[in-house]
Amino acid sequence: MQTYLSTKSIEYYLKELKEIFSQIWLKPSEIEKRCEELFKRSKEFDYKRILVSGETDNTTLYVIEDSSKIHVFSPNRDLRENPLLMRWHPSWYEIESKEIYYKCFLSCEELYEHLELPTVTLVNLCVIENFPIPRLNLSTGTLSSYLRKEQLAKVELIDMQVGTTINQIIKNLLDSQPDIIGLSVNFGQKKLAFEILDLIYSHIENGDLSSIITVGNVIPSFSPEQFFERYPSLLICDKEGEYTLRDLIKMLKKELKLDEVNGISYVDESGEVKHNVAETVNFKEEVPTPSLDILGEISKFRGALTLETSRGCDYSRCTFCPRDHKLRSWRPLSVEQTLKQLDDILRAGKHFNIKPHIYMADEEFIGELPNGTEAQRIIDICEGLLKREEKIKFDFAARADSVYEPKRTKEWNVERLKMWHYCALAGADRIFIGVESGSNQQLKRYGKGTTSEQNIIALRLVSALGINLRIGFIMFDQLMKGLDNLKENLDFLERTDALMKPIDIGDMTYEELYDKLLNDKEFIEKHKTGKPVYTIVSYMLASMEILMNTPYSRMVQLTERKEEVNLIMNDGKPDMNMGRYATSFVDKTNGNLSEACQMWIDSNFGVMYTIKSLHKVANPREKKKLYSYMETHREISHFLLKYLVYNLSPDKESQIILSDFLRMHSMEHILDNSKINVGDGSKENILNVMTNWQLIMEKLLRDVEADLNKGIITDSEDHRLHNTLKRWFSDMGNWSLINAYELN
């Protein structure tokens, strides 16, 4: 092994490559092109090809003259840590005692073979009509970055969020002929996946394509059999995909057999479905910054930045949450890795003029660590963010008992308040808390381990620190009887003592603030915003989705046996497009209300999702305007249900509240019109009420349309808000479900 470049030349190339590699948003093909331009100006190389592998800080350039001479440059990482070189020859650097950033290898036929990397194309599916505004995709982005970091494959990403069509996907696959094709199939994407897979397999049968095909994410892992019936040679990733793709590459190289591939399901030669054991991915050590190839295109559609800083959920007892396809243990990135990945994404976002606001995709951002050190971990991350010159914003999700847990000591809760204050100082903009219900009966059925009053206090503590809130709320569940749970939920959502104005705590200790927010009614009254809780509900009027493999699905089955009723429809077979069961309600009237409210949600979903997505990337003035639309929509939705419940169970207080709301919208005649009445709670009567209530929603959206036309708010480059508004107005009075149950 010898060096054929002068020290001066090596330093020059490392400096130039460092500058190119610092542009971490470039696709590998774009990096290779820039490297080729660099070396074309040089007379020191007569190379056959250039290969770029690695990601962010371990990107490596291989300049291949022929099998007898290969130059390797790694300006940011010591080559002694290079995974490809270590696979080739683990002791290649034994005689070297110093860090190595350049090496010329001679007579290296075996290394030459290692540089013949397999090709992998990963496709992120998306139904744009339902989710018009994109975000940095993590499912394929993280898998890609892992393969690149380990220098296992050349990876190309395709993302349907940015308008890529099925025909374009197929053309790309036929042109590039990848060794492995992977599809990420989320809720509601089964039909789209089948459409693409049908075309892929038709080309395989015709001899136009010879790739290994694998699919992953929620829907295939819930029920692989439905995919195998249609595509017997398909390989399904059951859980995390990093090690599965690693092993598929090894299988491609004949280093592993199919039954040795991590976490894969497949049909063996006898026709039996096999499930290989899945090893847990070392998330803390092995998963780098997601690939940022698509970020430039995402920015054109005013998309948002996302990041996952942990995986899993230690609680894992919510009855509606399936855990089989996820792992129960909570595994966070280290503080250093979290800050590094945040910096990578923010730097790339800045290049594309995406505002420095990151939406954390963690199931539970706070989590639990041995010896209760999770709060200190968050404080350390926040201290790191506070050292940044450029301030950022970030959103994340947490459990209510990560904020306030009455079963814990006062010291524990005060320490949590300190942690949340650090989050506020570091840029926490909005926290999603899975409140889910204001009814203690429902909370028990949901397995939340919290109470309605505990949830109120949690919201109070966080909002007092100036952090905005968003909550999950499951209004309806199939086992609720009568209207009591609904009334409790409506009362909870109308409470105005949960959301606080930001409080200056400069003159207070954390303990003093904690005591006041729990026990001082006068202090609470003075500092509350007066806004009701329904203004922060993420999706109003939502119903329980009974997903496969959940405790709640087993609760329904137990109720069927105990009460001798049939609740799960379709002969007990699930709707595989959404991985859920079509289930009747124990109480038929509640079932009618639930279905109608879901139609209300779906009728507004496209336009409200677009508004919410634009809100994420808007400037402060537009952000305020867009959020006002969201609040008004939530209020209209809340009072729709209140009116429906009032019709079924009238009371004087509700009549007064409804009268005030309707008068504000010049619709007070509804209360006195016997034709606009739920009557016996039939679906027809409920939809009749909703059609009239939709006139209130139309007024809101006409205001949105006017503001858009005046330039008060800004649309995406391809006018997605304009298009969703146009679609909404044309569909007025038509009630249907976006993802209706697939019944066989």
Curated annotation (Swiss-Prot):
Span of domain B12-binding: 119-259
EC number: 5.3.99.13
InterPro entries: Cobalamin-bd, Elp3/MiaA/NifB-like_rSAM, OxsB-like, rSAM, rSAM_horseshoe, Tetrapyrrole_Bchl_Biosynth_MTs
Binding of S-adenosyl-L-methionine, residues: 436, 545
Entry GO MF terms: 4 iron, 4 sulfur cluster binding; cobalamin binding; isomerase activity; metal ion binding
Chemical reaction(s) catalysed: dAMP + S-adenosyl-L-methionine = 4'-phospho-dehydrooxetanocin + 5'-deoxyadenosine + L-methionine + H(+); AH2 + 2 S-adenosyl-L-methionine = 2 5'-deoxyadenosin-5'-yl radical + 2 L-methionine + A + 2 H(+); 2 5'-deoxyadenosin-5'-yl radical + 2 dAMP + A = 2 4'-phospho-dehydrooxetanocin + 2 5'-deoxyadenosine + AH2
UniProt remark on domains: Contains four domains: an N-terminal domain of unknown function, a Rossmann fold that houses cobalamin, a partial triose phosphate isomerase barrel AdoMet radical domain and a C-terminal helix bundle.
Assigned protein family: Belongs to the radical SAM superfamily.
Name of the protein described by the UniProt record: 4'-phospho-dehydrooxetanocin synthase
Classification of source organism: Bacteria, Bacillati, Bacillota, Bacilli, Bacillales
Gene responsible for this protein: oxsB
